[in-house]
């Protein structure tokens, strides 16, 4: 029987899984692109889609529901002030999962999960330095 097979357990307890996806969702909202393992990325996608749908609603109840799922208020603020209006016209499909090879240490399949129509300037400091160096080489 296929009872209780609705999601990946990822060898973690319920509390650990909930914290993991709250942290990953916050990182994705902050940086708009993260690299993780393929099963985690596939499991994170519906969580983020639901958060963006809440942000599109934009009312107080939706904000409190999002705050219950995310760990930091700055992620909730960014979700409702930047990402919600950005995807107001799009009916779903806010993130994409791209396969990114295999991790060196254990050959785990890796993936990049990113927002569609993302802001390339929202990346972290290391990525900004790398992209600046690439642009300097091109000129």
UniProtKB/Swiss-Prot annotation:
Subunit comment: Part of the 50S ribosomal subunit. Contacts protein L32.
Domain of life: Bacteria
Gene for this chain: rplQ
Record-given protein name: Large ribosomal subunit protein bL17
InterPro entries per the UniProt record, alphabetical: Ribosomal_bL17, Ribosomal_bL17_CS, Ribosomal_bL17_sf
SUPFAM superfamilies in UniProt: Prokaryotic ribosomal protein L17
Statement: the UniProt record of this protein carries the keyword Cell division: no
Keywords, comma-separated and alphabetical: Ribonucleoprotein, Ribosomal protein
A GO molecular-function descriptor: structural constituent of ribosome
Gene3D superfamilies listed in its UniProt record: Ribosomal protein L17
GO cellular component, one term: cytosolic large ribosomal subunit
Protein family (similarity comment): Belongs to the bacterial ribosomal protein bL17 family.
Highest classification ranks of the organism: Bacteria, Pseudomonadati, Pseudomonadota, Alphaproteobacteria, Rhodobacterales
GO biological process, one term: translation
Keyword Ribosomal protein tagged: yes
């Amino acid at each position: 029987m296929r009872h209780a097979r609705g999601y990946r357990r990822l060898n973690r307890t319920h509390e650990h899984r909930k914290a993991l996806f709250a942290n990953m969702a916050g990182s994705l909202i902050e940086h708009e692109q993260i690299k993780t393992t393929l099963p985690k990325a596939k499991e994170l996608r519906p969580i983020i889609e639901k958060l963006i749908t809440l942000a599109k609603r934009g009312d107080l109840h939706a904000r409190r529901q999002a705050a219950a799922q995310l760990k930091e208020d700055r992620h909730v603020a960014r979700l409702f002030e930047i990402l919600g209006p950005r995807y107001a016209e799009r009916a779903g499909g806010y993130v994409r999962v791209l396969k990114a090879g295999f991790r060196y240490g254990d050959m785990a399949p890796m993936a990049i999960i990113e927002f569609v129509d993302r802001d390339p300037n929202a990346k972290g400091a290391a990525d900004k330095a790398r992209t600046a160096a690439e642009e300097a080489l091109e000129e």
